[in-house]
Amino acid sequence: MVCFSISFNRASFFSAAAPCTSSIPDFALIRPGVAMDSSLDEKNIHRPMIPNAATILMAWLLLTICFIPSFLAQSVQTFLFTNHQPSRLLVFITHVYCLMIKPFVLYFWFLFPLRLPGG
């Protein structure tokens, strides 16, 4: 049986996993997404996470408001660069959107739903 080492000496701190030599109870083993609490029963530990309506609504809003304009901006960029004389203002706007705003959209796409009650 392999579990994560809890001691903080130098040898075991830098190792990813160490064999369990002490008697650690079953509830103290580290499980992904589960708090280390002895009062949890098994049926609550393995309960699947079902997103609530607020999480689904936020995902739909982010998809329609943020990603669809991104695809439109990329298609406008493709149209402008195939044209021989593109408008410099439109090229600047699409560059600003694709290079500066889009990374923040992707950042909040992954982090904001985690802060919702059901996320």
UniProtKB/Swiss-Prot annotation:
Subcellular location: Membrane
Gene knockout outcome: Displays increased levels of spontaneous RAD52 foci in proliferating diploid cells.
Transmembrane intervals: 53-73, 92-112
GO biological process, one term: mitotic recombination
Entry annotated with the keyword Amino-acid biosynthesis: no
Superkingdom of origin organism: Eukaryota
Protein name as catalogued: Uncharacterized protein IRC16
Gene name per UniProt: IRC16
